[in-house]
Amino acid sequence: MMIFITQLIYIIEGKEKVFDRFEAIAIPSILKYHGRLLLRVRPTENSFIETNIEKPYEIHLIEFNSEQDFENFKHDEERKKFLYLKDQSIRTSILIKGTKL
């Protein structure tokens, strides 16, 4: 069953370039695991109509053919070599898993 991952990403101030380096590695590896980046949004202040949480730096919407494909992506050896970039740049994130209704 196709799954969708929405991620709200909050980065450490001043670490934008480090985050971009991690994304340059992580995003292409999605394809290896039957996934697809559907949206990558860096919202501006005017993008929000209403908010009751901290505004994220980026929002990603990704689809994978299955839960197993997502798990395989998370354990990708090449991606794991660069997790230190993620740790250096991302303060926190919120991951939401769902399916198409």
Regions found by a protein language model. Name each.
Residues 1-75, 97-101:
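Short S/T/G/P-rich N-terminal loop/turn motif that feeds into the first structured element of a domain
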